[in-house]
Amino acid sequence: MQKKYFGTDGIRGKVGNSLINAEFMLKLGWAVGRVLANSHSATVLIGKDTRISGYMIESALQAGLSAAGVNIKLTGPMPTPAIAYLTNSVRADAGIVISASHNHYPDNGVKFFNKDGFKLSDELELAIEKQIDKPMKTVVADRLGKAARMNEAHGRYIEFCKSTFPSNLTLKGLKIVVDCANGAAYAVAPSIFHELGAEVVAIADDPDGFNINQTCGATDTAHLQEMVVKHNADVGIAFDGDGDRLIMVDHHGLRVDGDELLCIMAIDRFYLKENAPLGVVGTIMSNLGLEQTLKRHHIAFERSPVGDRYVLDLMQQKGWFLGGESSGHIVDLGFTTTGDGVITALQILRIMQQAEKPLADLKKVMVKNPQVLINVPIKGILDIAQNPNIKKAITEAEKQLNGAGRILLRPSGTEPVIRVMVEGSDEGIVRQTAEMLAAAVQQSTL
């Protein structure tokens, strides 16, 4: 059955539209509560990022859950992976995160975790949707849910993250620039690295409700790259608005993406022979260089559709524990149930300290193929497969690559854009081909 409200990662959109408003969020909270009503004294954890609209959505969800007889624990601004961890840790029945991840402040959304800290199954999402379409009824007064602040949430998550770093190792001697994207990680990430001994320069750590992901964070690392060079830092770390993805910067000020970080982690495990990976999951967007490097080390590699949910699904099907995306979502089931930017950063820093090598040297393990990604804004729905102009452009692009590359056009699951990706052996031809395809898509939207 096709879902009516849920997308690839919860429910997301422009604040004030038909879904991201107080009325719908009230009903959504009630619907979630109804699905959990079979649980005795059900409790739901709610966290959020730093968007101004988070207050409205939090209040509406809280009212709906209470009306269904469910208790609520409120953490305030916390990274998405923190809610996944804490939901399981405090034995809550579900966790809710109010966030639109890497999008700017006019957008917001809601995503969910089950009691084990994993994202909801399709069956549960459909059950919630079924309740949304029913008339809302409030339980009697003595069964209303109660709400309480979880003041210890920050401290518990900080200690959990530190527990994933070897106790006989510190970050002393490292200077780290941390870009918090003016998002959910601002109150916890700098403290974690500082408590482990690093000298920390925090940037984009002053959210005002409107500046989340604004010229900062994992999707815009230009300022971080400048600051790493300016401060003569060893490494730069960039999170996105909800802290579940990570991009790093080496001491030369050069960006290190999710494919490279995933490769470093996989090869490290391979040589340590501790939990050596049987295989690694990437996506259809992952650089071919990642696949080639892993196969040289006899590590299997499989591609899933884009989205950390699909990465995790394939990991679980294969029985593998490591996977991720070029964008910086990296899932390590040895530590977490979802992508966690802080924990991924700690693993890379551990490798740097143990190997006594800078990130610039570690990333040399993988040679990236030239790859160009262009996001083309669209209005409405564009059928890529049936559009004659786009089909003609793809045929021409395949001729230009001459069998030595990959072409991928796909609609984003989170933004109104078509993503055009071209990969090949010659950077000039790759860029020219990508720009030609992007122009064809743009022309088709007029």
UniProtKB/Swiss-Prot annotation:
CDD domains: GlmM. The active site is at S101 (phosphoserine intermediate). Its cofactor is Mg(2+). SUPFAM superfamilies: Phosphoglucomutase, C-terminal domain (SSF55957), Phosphoglucomutase, first 3 domains (SSF53738). The modification Phosphoserine is found at S101. It catalyses: alpha-D-glucosamine 1-phosphate = D-glucosamine 6-phosphate. InterPro entries: A-D-PHexomutase_a/b/a-I, A-D-PHexomutase_a/b/a-I/II/III, A-D-PHexomutase_a/b/a-II, A-D-PHexomutase_a/b/a-III, A-D-PHexomutase_C, A-D-PHexomutase_C_sf, Alpha-D-phosphohexomutase_SF, GlmM_bact. Activated by phosphorylation. Belongs to the phosphohexose mutase family. Catalyzes the conversion of glucosamine-6-phosphate to glucosamine-1-phosphate. This is Phosphoglucosamine mutase. The lineage of its organism: Bacteria, Pseudomonadati, Pseudomonadota, Gammaproteobacteria, Legionellales.
